[in-house]
């Protein structure tokens, strides 16, 4: 059911991607043909759609009995801190955002041997407790609010309330 909802969200987001990017461009006073409008594509529909696809792949892996991080490179820093290298994952990402890397530095006590015990915890519970989260939409990157919402829904299994700031009204 969750994968089906992600598929529907991906489809609808693709349908409205241009409108979404153009709304951000207009809200920031940029011309649609300005090179700077590309930031609205990268920081809006692209970032959101990319995350949705990764979440879909993660849910499929979990459903198949695999680790949620089975494709993530794990290493240790010189001080012993465990690091998960989560971006880029493929040639397109390397080319699109050259020299842009995303590493997650784990808390003390998390090691390459026990990192699996710390991820996808919601999906390891037999009967998870219901929770409600409040997302405050106040940023100037248009994908942040939907990413926060979907993270809470999918990674933590929480219901979400959202409060948008007036300057983000264009996001609907």
Can you say where each PLM-predicted feature lies in the sequence?
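PLP-dependent aminotransferase-like
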Residues: 132, 144-172
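N-terminal Rossmann-like NAD(P)+-binding subdomain of aldehyde/semialdehyde dehydrogenases
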Residues: 1-115, 152, 166-170
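A short, basic/flexible loop-to-alpha-helix module at the beginning of a structural domain
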Residues: 33, 115-126
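A short, charged/proline- and glycine-enriched loop
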Residues: 80-81, 126-132
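Short, glycine-rich nucleotide/cofactor-binding loops
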Residues: 135-143
């Amino acid at each position: 059911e969750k994968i089906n909802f992600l598929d529907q969200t991906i489809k609808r987001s693709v349908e409205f991607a241009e409108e979404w990017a153009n709304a951000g461009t207009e809200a920031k006073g940029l011309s649609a043909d300005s090179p700077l409008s590309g930031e609205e594509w990268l920081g809006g529909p692209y970032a959101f759609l990319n995350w949705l696809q990764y979440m879909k792949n993660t849910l499929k892996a979990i459903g198949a009995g695999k680790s949620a991080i089975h494709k993530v490179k794990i290493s240790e820093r010189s001080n012993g801190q465990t690091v998960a290298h989560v971006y880029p994952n493929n040639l397109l990402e390397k080319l699109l955002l050259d020299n842009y890397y995303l590493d997650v530095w784990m808390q003390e006590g998390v090691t390459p041997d026990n990192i699996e015990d710390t991820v996808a915890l919601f999906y390891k519970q037999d009967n998870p407790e219901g929770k409600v989260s409040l997302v405050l939409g106040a940023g100037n990157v248009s994908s942040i609010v939907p990413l926060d919402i979907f993270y809470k829904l999918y990674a933590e299994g929480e219901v979400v309330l959202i409060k948008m700031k007036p300057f983000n009204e264009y996001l609907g």
